């Protein structure tokens, strides 16, 4: 099993049309852990490893309001290994986060599936 831990800072008080605009002073701390299991898959005459995400959780805290805490999803299984793209794109505005996570299979809407 391979584990990747990541932390990102995201901006709040922005609508999705402002996703690439100037930063807002309030920052949200978003942290999470993703775990993968590598399984061999036979395709034709060769066996290839298959990355399969077996767990994903996102923790959201605010540096302005210490009482704010949210945990989005955990224990999601799936065959999409692209959740690792969060590691490659660490700065995502808060209002854009759910749509970004949905595109990687980690959004709150896809966690219940």
UniProtKB/Swiss-Prot annotation:
GO terms for cellular component: chloroplast. It comes from the Eukaryota. InterPro entries: Uncharacterised_Ycf68. Keywords: Chloroplast, Plastid. Pfam families: DUF2647. It is found in: Plastid, Chloroplast. PANTHER family: ORF16-LACZ FUSION PROTEIN-RELATED. Belongs to the ycf68 family. This is Uncharacterized protein ycf68. It comes from Eucalyptus globulus subsp. globulus. The gene is ycf68-1.
